[in-house]
């Protein structure tokens, strides 16, 4: 088959893999709610944890992480090189953030970004997990913890693999969810006030949903 056609197939497949609306489906299946209308109204795993339940949240988190890895794996299976695999990774994030099934209103791409970087640099997974757990223990702030922990993959690409291409790509992948989250952070701060912003972002009753 023509190589250009294979590239197009890989990119389209990546978008539709990314657009699988796991948070929306979890809300409908487990609680008969539209996740876009409760909590933060975000199509992400944290909103599912808080408003649907712990195990549905784990399922959604695993699915969203898997979407990023699967998009790259499919491109690899189709015989595409790392450059096309990276483009497919970005298409998976685009699908997650702008799913055609939900009028292009999706999540922010954080979990999908984790899957992408974990697929590219599996040796960074234990470092990422360790960083996340340490930061969570210190800050009790999940969004901040997983965001800062992304640095572990960037360091693996830079110091471990000495691959500047992967470093730059990792930075791009990490910046997408960060930029997507800025409006939400401003909204929370404006509603809660600076003194209560952290409490509003992270509700400590997650254990009650076990």
Swiss-Prot record:
The chain crosses the membrane at residues 4-24, 52-72, 73-93, 114-134, 141-161, 163-183. Pathway: Lipid metabolism; phospholipid metabolism. It is a multi-pass membrane protein. It catalyses: an acyl phosphate + sn-glycerol 3-phosphate = a 1-acyl-sn-glycero-3-phosphate + phosphate. One of its GO terms (cellular component) is plasma membrane. Its EC number is 2.3.1.275. Coiled coil: none annotated. Its main location: membrane. Signal peptide: none annotated. It is found in: Cell membrane. Keywords: Cell membrane, Lipid biosynthesis, Lipid metabolism, Membrane, Phospholipid biosynthesis, Phospholipid metabolism, Transferase, Transmembrane, Transmembrane helix. One of its GO terms (molecular function) is acyl-phosphate glycerol-3-phosphate acyltransferase activity. One of its GO terms (biological process) is phospholipid biosynthetic process. Catalyzes the transfer of an acyl group from acyl-phosphate (acyl-PO(4)) to glycerol-3-phosphate (G3P) to form lysophosphatidic acid (LPA). This enzyme utilizes acyl-phosphate as fatty acyl donor, but not acyl-CoA or acyl-ACP. NCBIfam families: PRK14414.1. Belongs to the PlsY family. Probably interacts with PlsX. This is Glycerol-3-phosphate acyltransferase 2. It comes from Dehalococcoides mccartyi (strain CBDB1).
